């Protein structure tokens, strides 16, 4: 098999543009009295598995794509063996490189009729073996996409016909609520333990809060409270930022001045007067708020706003505990420790003195803590003889000598075993110590709540009554 160049067909006779590539026909070496049967589809259309128009002067697809339209010998009928086909393919490639193909021919009418009626060569698996390397080169040149087939038809705005782009599949639902004023978009937060190393303003601003973050005001539950999951948070979950906090030793807080700035909404001079000098990271928040609100109505999430969000989140956390029916004393004591630790951090910054909103929310949180203690002590009272547990664990399998209620099982120091009376006394001490912490918080909140009668008085009475009940029962 070899390339046999034939004469050009005049463009005027074929009525084709002069820019079209010449047609090549592949036929075997030597003369044969039997007429040659050609494929009904050119090699380009056959390799791309598309319908070929079948013009011997060049099919429509090759003319549109400026390809060289080549028709091969039809392999219908008796074919040579595997070894002969392999040798013939190598010889065909060598002769094609030595003898350039620059001419085309028009077959007679009889052979043309045979080409158009012959359809079996399209599905013949042996027909591509003779020209394996030729078809491989054509496959590399054949475009598969719509943009590559018709580059002039595509426009810059027609990027994709699919409305759901690949990147859109990974957009979280909270990101669809476009809110540039959301403080969660300007501060990074995660449910992992915070790293107290310093961060730059750029790093803090570009970090995005994941869905379900702690302080996102839009991530509020929409289902009824009993159906909400129990929030097992820790103290680090309440920190709104990872910036080190300095102690309250720089004098009284400075009152805020109204927002005013001619350029971008922020400057070094205005930042000093805008926020309190005792809250260094609140000034950072105001700077981020100015950067995100350039060109829009000023809306700042300052330190006071952040504090109210934190207090509201604490109240929500404790309400889930109450609605979830948490009565195990170990869980109640751990919840009290976590919550009071965060409340103490807020009080140390003096945030409850700047406005009554924060103080009232903290008072509600203390009331919820006392409610948890009352339910836990009532559930685990010594009079409940059929329940002997600590933290909700059944201790009936440990022995019949457990007459107390919510006691500490098998507590010892090395070989020294602590008896039941000592365990009850230890439990009483731990409960009273946690309640004394609530009394300390109420003492700090009393001056910040300008109400008469002060609601802290009634809550302190409840705490003292609960402490007396615990001491008398043990």
From Swiss-Prot:
Task performed by this protein: Transcription factor that specifically regulates the gene cluster that mediates the biosynthesis of aspirochlorine (or antibiotic A30641), an unusual halogenated spiro compound with distinctive antifungal properties due to selective inhibition of protein biosynthesis, and which is also active against bacteria, viruses, and murine tumor cells.
Listed Gene3D superfamilies: Zn(2)-C6 fungal-type DNA-binding domain
Keywords: DNA-binding, Metal-binding, Nucleus, Transcription, Transcription regulation, Zinc
PANTHER family: THIAMINE REPRESSIBLE GENES REGULATORY PROTEIN THI5, ZN(II)2CYS6 TRANSCRIPTION FACTOR (EUROFUNG)
Compartments where located: Nucleus
Origin species: Aspergillus oryzae (strain ATCC 42149 / RIB 40)
Pfam annotation, one family: Zn_clus
DNA-binding residues: 42-69
Basic and acidic residues composition bias: residue spans: 117-138
Main localization (coarse): nucleus
One biological process term in Gene Ontology: positive regulation of transcription by RNA polymerase II
GO molecular function: DNA-binding transcription factor activity, RNA polymerase II-specific; sequence-specific DNA binding; zinc ion binding
Keyword check for Nucleus: yes
Presence of the UniProt keyword Nucleus in the record: yes
Name recorded for this polypeptide: C6 finger domain transcription factor aclZ
Cellular component GO terms held in the UniProt record: nucleus
Feature: compositional bias, Polar residues: 90-105
Gene it is expressed from: aclZ
Segments of this protein annotated with the region Disordered: 85-148, 177-206
């Amino acid at each position: 098999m070899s390339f046999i160049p034939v004469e050009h067909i005049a463009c005027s006779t074929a009525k084709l543009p002069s820019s079209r590539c010449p047609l090549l026909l592949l036929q075997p070496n030597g003369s044969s009295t039997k007429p040659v049967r050609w494929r009904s589809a050119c090699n380009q259309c056959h390799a791309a598995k598309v319908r070929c128009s079948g013009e011997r002067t060049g099919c429509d697809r090759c003319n549109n794509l400026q390809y060289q339209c080549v028709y091969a010998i039809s392999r219908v009928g008796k074919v040579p063996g595997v070894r002969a086909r392999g040798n013939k393919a190598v010889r065909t490639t060598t002769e094609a490189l030595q003898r350039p193909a620059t001419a085309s021919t028009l077959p007679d009418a009889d052979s043309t009729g045979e080409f158009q009626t012959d359809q079996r060569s399209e599905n013949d698996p042996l027909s591509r073996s003779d020209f394996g390397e030729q078809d491989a080169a054509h496959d590399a040149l054949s475009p598969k996409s719509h943009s590559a087939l018709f580059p002039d038809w595509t426009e810059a705005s027609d990027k994709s016909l699919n409305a759901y782009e690949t990147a859109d599949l990974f957009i979280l639902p909270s990101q669809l609520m476009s809110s540039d004023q959301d403080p969660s978009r300007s501060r990074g937060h995660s449910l992992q333990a915070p790293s107290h190393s310093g961060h730059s303003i750029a790093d803090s601003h570009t970090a995005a809060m994941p869905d379900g973050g702690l302080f996102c005001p839009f991530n509020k539950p929409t289902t009824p409270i009993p159906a909400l999951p129990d929030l097992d948070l820790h103290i680090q979950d309440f920190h709104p930022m990872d910036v080190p906090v300095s102690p309250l030793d720089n004098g009284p807080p400075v009152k805020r001045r109204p927002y005013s700035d001619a350029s971008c909404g922020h400057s070094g001079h205005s930042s000093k007067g805008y926020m309190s000098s005792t809250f260094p990271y609140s000034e950072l928040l105001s700077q981020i708020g100015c950067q995100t609100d350039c060109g829009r109505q000023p809306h700042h999430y300052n330190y006071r706003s952040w504090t109210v969000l934190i207090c509201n989140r604490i109240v929500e956390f404790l309400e889930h505990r109450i609605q979830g029916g948490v009565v195990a004393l170990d869980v109640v004591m751990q919840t009290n420790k976590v919550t009071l630790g965060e409340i103490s951090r807020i009080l140390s910054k003096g945030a409850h003195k700047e406005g009554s909103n924060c103080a009232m929310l903290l008072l509600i949180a203390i009331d919820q803590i006392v409610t948890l203690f009352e339910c836990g002590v009532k559930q685990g009272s010594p009079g409940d003889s059929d329940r002997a547990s600590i933290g909700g664990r059944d201790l009936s399998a440990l022995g019949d000598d457990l007459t107390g209620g919510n006691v500490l099982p098998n507590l010892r120091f090395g070989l020294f075993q602590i008896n039941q009376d000592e365990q009850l006394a230890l439990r009483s001490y731990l409960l009273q110590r946690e309640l004394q912490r609530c009394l300390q918080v109420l003492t700090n909140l009393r001056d910040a709540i300008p109400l008469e009668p002060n609601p802290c008085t009634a809550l302190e009475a409840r705490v003292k009554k609960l402490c007396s009940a615990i001491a008398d029962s043990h």
